[in-house]
Amino acid sequence: LKGALHTSSTRIGYPLQVHRSRPAAEQGTVLFEDDELTVRCTPLTHRVPAYAYRVDQKPLAGRFDIDKARSLGIPPGPVYARLKRGESVTLEDGRVIDGTTLCGPERPGVSVMICTDTVFCDAAVELARGVDLLIHESTFAHAEAEMAFQKQHSTSTMAAQTAAEAGVGQLAITHLSPRYVPGNPVSPDDLLKEAQAIFPNTV
């Protein structure tokens, strides 16, 4: 990473923290976690080490009911931020307002998984279970499945099979071979249709 930044004369103005994928993937532990996100990864099936990464947003606070706050005579301002966080606040008139009474139910966070270079593998299916969006490589068309296995890349149908078996919300196929350009016998639209035949909610 340092070499790439140096060679490209890239300067970043924020702290960079490196997390090693291999130990977390092999042990099935969390790669990264903070107050908002959890990141996990798993090894894939490819000629060189490759990993899938899943990011889960933690549950979000319920929506703040501004109309209810106004009806209680709570003036807009910084106090709203505290109430949105569910804190109890003492107003200037002495009333104590419990912020949780002004917020709706907790909302689930969203989840995204990116599946880099791989042929179809069970590990990807397991990590992707129930994810909202699966971004999956789709290098080859189904007709070139033999080549996909040789090169350890996925076909459009393998990506769709992963999505279907994992019960994901939506599949986005990416990493298409440059051979599938408009005007060629097989185009990106053909790969999309192949995937949609197995998993309709594919883009």
Please provide the spans of the model-predicted regions:
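Active-site HxH/HxHxD metal-binding segment of metal-dependent hydrolases
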Residues: 1-23
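Short, conserved catalytic or adaptor-binding loops enriched in Gly and charged residues
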Residues: 8-11, 30-32, 105, 194-197
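A short helix-to-beta-strand connector/capping loop
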Residues: 12-17, 34-35, 109-110, 198-201
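A structural signal for isolated positions on well-ordered beta-strands in alpha/beta enzyme cores
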Residues: 17, 113, 170-172
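General small-molecule cofactor/ligand-binding pocket signal
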Residues: 17-21, 40-42, 203
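Residues that form or immediately flank small-molecule/cofactor binding pockets and catalytic motifs
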Residues: 21-26, 44-46
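Active-site-proximal loop/helix segment associated with metal-binding centers of metalloenzymes
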Residues: 32-114, 118-127, 133-135
